[in-house]
């Protein structure tokens, strides 16, 4: 199912659903960041997705990283909360989401890289190369906040 992301766009459709989601900035021992090229919009993104009713938010991030990349991770911190109502995601099935995302930091504790049906490519990216990848504004913001090494998480 394809999707289109909107940010501060007066032509964006109105949301008909709110989804609580979690994402994770997963780094390797060289400080590179794990990204996936999404099949549904061909943009690079952090691993992440919607919370199940039986999940905690950190558990959601751990599960989504495993499902989307094959890696087992441990949550190590919090990048921030992202609840901007100007960010809307429209799916081809008619769902238009306003997303509530909590972004964590995580370290790899096992598994091996394996592309899921949600992505076409997985890559560990050195921070200076992030700007060269096609990526939605909201993903760039999470990465920027991570790279700033903030004393406190972003709350927005």
Regions found by a protein language model. Give the residues of each.
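Short connector loops at helix/strand junctions that flank enzyme active sites
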Residues: 19, 39-41, 46, 73, ...
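Conserved Nudix-box catalytic region and its N-terminal flanking loop in Nudix hydrolases
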Residues: 28, 32-68
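Nudix hydrolase/Nudix homology domain
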Residues: 42-43, 112-156
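A short coil-to-beta-strand element that immediately follows conserved catalytic motifs
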Residues: 72-81
